[in-house]
From Swiss-Prot:
Name recorded for this polypeptide: KAT8 regulatory NSL complex subunit 2
Organismal lineage: Eukaryota, Metazoa, Chordata, Craniata, Vertebrata
Originating organism: Rattus norvegicus (Rat)
Known function: Non-catalytic component of the NSL histone acetyltransferase complex, a multiprotein complex that mediates histone H4 acetylation at 'Lys-5'- and 'Lys-8' (H4K5ac and H4K8ac) at transcription start sites and promotes transcription initiation. Required for NSL complex stability and for transcription of intraciliary transport genes in both ciliated and non-ciliated cells by regulating histone H4 acetylation at 'Lys-5'- and 'Lys-12' (H4K5ac and H4K12ac). This is necessary for cilium assembly in ciliated cells and for organization of the microtubule cytoskeleton in non-ciliated cells.
Subunit structure, as described in the record: Component of the NSL complex at least composed of KAT8/MOF, KANSL1, KANSL2, KANSL3, MCRS1, PHF20, OGT1/OGT, WDR5 and HCFC1.
Record field: compositional bias (Basic and acidic residues): 135-144
Biased composition (Acidic residues): 167-178
Chain intervals for the UniProt region annotation (Required for interaction with other NSL complex members): 308-364
PANTHER family the UniProt entry points to: KAT8 REGULATORY NSL COMPLEX SUBUNIT 2
Length: 488
C-alpha cells in the first residue's frame, strides 16, 4: 500500500503575537559606583559623568563662583572656538535671565510724548480743515512711524553683559530657595541688629586670630634672642655684662647702655607682685575650664576626721581621701592596710603589689638566707688557754740583768702551787743539747727554783744563762715602785 504523507504547516491562528519591546536605554558606565542614569546618545556615560570620557564633546562649565572661587563641576558642550566660554544648562539659563533683566534696565519704557505722538494718527480732524500739504505730511509721518522698528536699537556692549552678583546665592545649583527680598536694600531694625552682630562677631574672630599671630611672632623673636644671647655668652663669656675691666671708653659707654636696657623692662617691689597676680588671673581666664577644674581639684582636702578635726592633707587624684586615710574609702582597690606583727598591729596604707600580704617597710619579711657560712672548727678541751696570770707580758720579758739560770724537770712556784712549763723565750737558741740530756730533762725528776733575785736554777744540770728578773708583785711603795716579795 502506498502511504500518503501530509505535512501540516503551523499557523498563527489562536496565538498572541508578541509585541516587540522597546530596547531599554543602557545605564551609565561609571566605574567608581553604580549609576542608574541613562547614557547620552552615542556615549557611554550620562550627563553627570560624561567628563570621564576625554573624547566626548563636553567640557567643564566655565562658571566660577564669586564666593569661594570654585568652578562649576557640571558638564557643558564644547564651543566651536578652542578658548570659547561654555556654560552648563543651569548656568546658561541663569545667564539668559540675567541678560534679559539687564536689557530691560538699559531700555526704559516709552515716554508720554512718544505715546501721544504714536496715537495722534488715530485722532479725527475737522472736515474741510485738512489741506493737501497737511495730508501729505501726515502720510509721510505715518510711513516713518511704520518703518520704525526694534532693529534700530543700539547693540549690547561688553559692559552690559551679566557677570554675576557677588552677593547673590546663585553660586550653587542646589540653592533653589532664595530670599526674594535679599537684595532689596531695605531692612528692619531687627535685621540691621542681626547683620551688625554677625559682622562684629566676624571682626572679633579676626582680631583674635591677629592677636594669636602677634603672640607667635613675639615668642619666635624671643626664642631667637635667647639663642643668640646664649651663643654670645659661650663665645665671649659674661665679662661684657658684668664688669668694665679691660674695656675702652666707648665700650664702657655701650656696656652702660646695655645694662640700662636690661633693667628697663624689669619690675621691682609692689609692681612685680601686682604683675605676677595679673599674669595668674589672665592664665586662669584664658586656659578655660581645664585650668579651673585643675585649681578646683588642687583645693580639695581629705574628708577624714581625726579627733573631730578634719584632715588638712590634699586628697589623692580621683579620690576624696589622702594617702594616710585612703583605706577608709570602701570603693578603692589600690591600697591595703599593713597587717604588722602579732605583738604590734600596723594600719599603715600600703599599695597593692604582686604579693598576697603587702607590708610596710618596717614589717617587711625578709626572704630566707641563701648563703650558709662555713662551720668553725671547735677547739679541743685539752688545748684551752690557761689563766692570763701565768703568762708574761712584753714589758716583763725585757732583759735588765744577766743572771744564771738553773733548769730543772719540774717547775714549782711556791705560793701558786700550779705547774707551768718553762717559757721558750728564756732559752738561748745557741744552746745545743744532746738527745739524752733532752730526754733526761723531759723525764727525770728535778726542780726549778726561783731565787729571790728572779733567776731560775736547774738541779741536775748546771747551766748558767742570763735571764730577765721576774717582776715583783706586791704593795706599792711611796715612790710608786712595787715592793719586792720573796718567793721561796
Amino acid at each position: 500500500m502506498n502511504r500518503i504523507r501530509i505535512h501540516v504547516l503551523p499557523t498563527n491562528r489562536g496565538r498572541i503575537t508578541p509585541v516587540p519591546r522597546s530596547q531599554e536605554p543602557l545605564s551609565c558606565s561609571f566605574t567608581h559606583r553604580p549609576c542608574s542614569q541613562p547614557r547620552l546618545e552615542g556615549q557611554e556615560f550620562c550627563l553627570k559623568h560624561i567628563l570621564e570620557d576625554k573624547n566626548a564633546p563636553f567640557k567643564q562649565c566655565s562658571y566660577i563662583s564669586t564666593k569661594n572661587g570654585k568652578r562649576c563641576p557640571s558638564a557643558a558642550p564644547k564651543p566651536e572656538k578652542k578658548d570659547g566660554v561654555s556654560f552648563c544648562a543651569e548656568h546658561a539659563r541663569r545667564n539668559a535671565l540675567a541678560l534679559h533683566a539687564q536689557m530691560k534696565k538699559s531700555n526704559p519704557g516709552p515716554m508720554g510724548e512718544t505715546l501721544l505722538c504714536q496715537l495722534s494718527s488715530y485722532a479725527k480732524t475737522e472736515l474741510g480743515s485738512q489741506t493737501p500739504e497737511s495730508s501729505r505730511s501726515e502720510a509721510s509721518r505715518i510711513l516713518d512711524e511704520d518703518s520704525w522698528s526694534d532693529g534700530d536699537q543700539e547693540p549690547i556692549t561688553v559692559d552690559q553683559t551679566w557677570r554675576g552678583d557677588p552677593d547673590s546665592e546663585a553660586d550653587s545649583i542646589d540653592s533653589d530657595q532664595e530670599d526674594p527680598l535679599k537684595h532689596a536694600g531695605v531692612y528692619t531694625a531687627e535685621e540691621v541688629a542681626l547683620i551688625m552682630r554677625e559682622k562684629l562677631i566676624r571682626l572679633q574672630s579676626l582680631y583674635i586670630d591677629q592677636f594669636k599671630r602677634l603672640q607667635h611672632l613675639l615668642k619666635e623673636k624671643k626664642r631667637r634672642y635667647l639663642h643668640n644671647r646664649k651663643v654670645e655668652h659661650e663665645a665671649l663669656g659674661s665679662s661684657l655684662l658684668t664688669g668694665p675691666e679691660g674695656l675702652l671708653a666707648k665700650e664702657r659707654e655701650n656696656l652702660k647702655r646695655l645694662k640700662c636696657l636690661r633693667r628697663y623692662r624689669q619690675r621691682y617691689g609692689v609692681e612685680a607682685l601686682l604683675h605676677r597676680q595679673l599674669k595668674e588671673r589672665r592664665m586662669l581666664a584664658t586656659e578655660g575650664a581645664a585650668q579651673q577644674a585643675h585649681t578646683t581639684r588642687s583645693s580639695q582636702r581629705c574628708l577624714a576626721f581625726v579627733d573631730d578635726v578634719r584632715c588638712s592633707n590634699q586628697s589623692l587624684p580621683m579620690t576624696r581621701h589622702c594617702l594616710t586615710h585612703i583605706c577608709q574609702d570602701t570603693n578603692q582597690v589600690l591600697f591595703k592596710c599593713c597587717q604588722g606583727s602579732e605583738e604590734v598591729p600596723c594600719n599603715k596604707p600600703v599599695p597593692v603589689s604582686l604579693s598576697e600580704d603587702p607590708c610596710c617597710p618596717l614589717h617587711f619579711q625578709l626572704p630566707p638566707q641563701m648563703y650558709k657560712p662555713e662551720q668553725v672548727l671547735s677547739v679541743p678541751d685539752g688545748l684551752e688557754a690557761g689563766p692570763m696570770d701565768l703568762y708574761l707580758s712584753a714589758a716583763e720579758l725585757q732583759p735588765t740583768e744577766s743572771l744564771p739560770l738553773e733548769l730543772s724537770d719540774d717547775l714549782d712556784v711556791v705560793g701558786d702551787g700550779m705547774p707551768c712549763p718553762p717559757s721558750p723565750l728564756l732559752f738561748d737558741p745557741s744552746l745545743t743539747l744532746e738527745d739524752h740530756s733532752v730526754t733526761e730533762i723531759a723525764g727525770g725528776p728535778g726542780q726549778i727554783q726561783v731565787a729571790g733575785d728572779g733567776c731560775r736554777s736547774q738541779g741536775p744540770h748546771n747551766v748558767e744563762k742570763t735571764c730577765a728578773p721576774f717582776p715583783q708583785r706586791g704593795l706599792a711603795t711611796a715612790n710608786g715602785k712595787p715592793e719586792p716579795t720573796s718567793i721561796s
